[in-house]
């Protein structure tokens, strides 16, 4: 379930004491270096709660159909709400955007009003924030105030929400409370009960990663490879080269998928120097999840991927990703799973191509052909397309079933030290088409995906526009096997892009400890207290 609606989630937000600036456009904004968009949204929600409570203005906590937090207030109290928020936001970059009338610009609440409209029914409030690199937290991450009409027998809402119609018989509305983000909220019965359309199960994420900069690893790999024949490009430095992409891939999860329960990193490398001990992160060496330890050590990603379902304590539903795959904007769990657990995968337009597996082909192309032959033999159906280079959803139970269905292929792939012409590729695409044919998967056709070859100038030149627009759900920054761009130039441009796209350090990074994760049960630095007092930053900062 999305963090915004989960009754079990009291995940705290980090406290910040960031300066307020005026931008070139004349807008006021707070510099933001620690909060993710989700955390900033919840901080603003609690700020508004405290401001309304301080003014003795009652409200209901509502969930809209997009899981945005909504505070519903009697329309007769709108003038009092405006006065209370103007006072509370006197020194805050809080903006209000009228949603139910088009063409109205957001207004700075401190200037004395919530809307330019004479009768606004839906106003979205948000503190403008600018993160390093220029990432802006705008109205997309705001909290809505909805003004409802409470009549003698009816309640009229300006828009439907996740539970109700626009017109409610008062006798059918049952008050309820919910504890969320460390507070008890008044709401309507059923509003935050898990809905049939919610994804409510735990979802973990697995990354496979290798530190290709480790000279000892490189020496061992080179020595072993001298005894093997590998396919096209499989001996390239790009197969193992890394420039801390994992750090930014993990930041993308922290920023845009707060519903992930745990993250497992499957690796035999020493953990990266920037990674701290953290309860959300578990390092998993191959010996902990390979069924046949005699197959180790391995330098074969297909082998690792064939054993992911054996990772201890991994949830039934999980995602798998590489360190060059990134979440590009906020995502819901429903991007990957249906409420019933059906996985959703993204097909590429690229066809697999004709012919069978051949030792001279790349491991990727060979595995696709082996997958095709295996499924054709088992089901009499032909797969024709590759998958996009993105994070993929998987289910442990289906993977165990596949291992029983194709034991020789799983064993052979596990035993391949390097990518082989006879490997299966479980995560791309054997699992997904097996699950599709057997009714456990469907195609995800709404996702926006971008593949970038960062070893070409054409690919690198896509990055500025990608950062500016941020209009893809997923993107892959692939390190090609036949580079056009010098390695140092590529590294500089890619890292610069990633640092600006994902500027917020994740809580598992070793960073300067000038902030702590905030407890939602304590007041925010600038928020009015609920007992009518004002928070003193010197006392509340810790």
Swiss-Prot record:
Pfam families: Stealth_CR1, Stealth_CR2, Stealth_CR3, Stealth_CR4. GO terms for biological process: polysaccharide biosynthetic process. Its EC number is 2.7.-.-. GO terms for molecular function: transferase activity, transferring phosphorus-containing groups. Residues 522-542 are annotated as: Disordered. InterPro entries: Stealth, Stealth_CR1, Stealth_CR2, Stealth_CR3, Stealth_CR4. Residues 533-542 have a biased composition (Polar residues). Keywords: Exopolysaccharide synthesis, Transferase. It comes from the Bacteria. Belongs to the stealth family. PANTHER family: N-ACETYLGLUCOSAMINE-1-PHOSPHOTRANSFERASE SUBUNITS ALPHA_BETA, PTHR24045. Stealth proteins are part of a protein family that is conserved from bacteria to higher eukaryotes. Family members were first identified in microbes as proteins that help pathogens to elude the host innate immune system. Microbial stealth proteins are involved in the biosynthesis of exopolysaccharides. Stealth proteins are predicted to function as hexose-1-phosphoryltransferases. This is Exopolysaccharide phosphotransferase CpsY.
């Amino acid at each position: 379930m999305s963090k915004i609606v989960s009754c079990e989630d009291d995940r705290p937000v980090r406290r910040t004491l960031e300066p307020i600036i005026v931008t070139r456009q004349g807008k006021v904004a707070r510099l933001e270096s620690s909060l993710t968009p989700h955390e900033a949204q919840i901080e603003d929600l609690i700020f508004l709660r405290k401001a309304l409570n301080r003014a003795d203005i009652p409200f209901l906590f509502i969930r809209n159909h997009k899981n945005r937090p909504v505070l519903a207030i009697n329309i007769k109290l709108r003038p009092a709400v405006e006065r209370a928020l103007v006072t509370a936001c006197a020194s805050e970059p809080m903006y209000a955007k009228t949603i139910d009338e088009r063409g109205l610009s957001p207004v700075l609440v401190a200037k004395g009003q919530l809307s330019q409209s004479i009768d606004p029914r839906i106003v979205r409030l948000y503190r403008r924030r600018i993160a390093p690199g220029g990432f802006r937290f705008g109205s997309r991450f705001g909290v809505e105030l909805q003004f409802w009409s409470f009549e003698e027998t009816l309640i009229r809402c300006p828009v439907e929400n996740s539970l109700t119609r626009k017109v409610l018989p008062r006798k059918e509305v049952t008050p309820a409370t919910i504890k969320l983000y460390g507070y008890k909220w008044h709401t309507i019965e059923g509003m935050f009960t898990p809905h049939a359309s919610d994804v409510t199960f735990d979802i973990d994420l697995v990354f496979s990663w290798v530190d290709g900069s480790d000279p000892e690893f490189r020496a061992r790999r080179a020595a072993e490879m001298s005894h093997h024949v590998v396919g096209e490009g499989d001996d390239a430095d790009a197969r193992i080269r890394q420039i801390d992409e994992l750090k930014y891939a993990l930041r993308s999860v922290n920023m845009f998928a707060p519903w992930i329960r745990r993250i497992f990193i499957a690796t035999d490398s020493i953990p990266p120097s920037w990674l701290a001990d953290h309860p959300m992160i578990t390092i998993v060496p191959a010996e902990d999840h390979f069924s046949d330890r005699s197959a180790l050590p391995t330098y074969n990603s297909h082998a690792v991927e064939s054993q992911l379902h054996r990772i201890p304590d991994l949830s039934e539903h999980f995602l798998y990703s590489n360190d060059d795959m990134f979440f590009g904007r906020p995502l819901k769990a429903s991007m990957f799973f249906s409420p019933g657990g059906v996985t959703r995968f993204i097909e590429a337009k690229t066809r697999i191509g004709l012919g069978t597996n051949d030792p001279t082909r790349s491991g990727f192309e060979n595995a696709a052909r082996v997958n095709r032959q295996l499924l054709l033999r088992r089901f009499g159906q032909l797969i024709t397309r590759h998958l996009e280079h993105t994070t993929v959803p998987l289910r442990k139970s289906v993977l165990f079933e596949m291992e029983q269905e194709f034991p020789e292929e799983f064993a052979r792939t596990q035993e391949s030290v390097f990518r082989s012409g006879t490997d299966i590729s479980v995560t791309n695409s054997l699992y997904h088409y097996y699950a599709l044919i057997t009714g456990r998967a469907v195609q995800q056709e709404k996702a926006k995906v971008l593949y970038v070859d960062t070893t070409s100038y054409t690919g690198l030149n896509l990055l500025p526009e990608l950062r500016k627009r941020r209009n893809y759900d997923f993107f892959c920054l692939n390190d090609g096997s036949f580079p056009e761009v010098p390695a140092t130039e590529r590294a500089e441009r890619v890292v610069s892009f990633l640092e600006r796209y994902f500027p917020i350090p994740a809580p598992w990074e070793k960073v300067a400890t000038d902030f702590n994760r905030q407890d939602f049960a304590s007041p925010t630095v600038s928020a009015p207290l609920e007992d009518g007092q004002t928070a003193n930053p010197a006392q509340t900062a810790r």
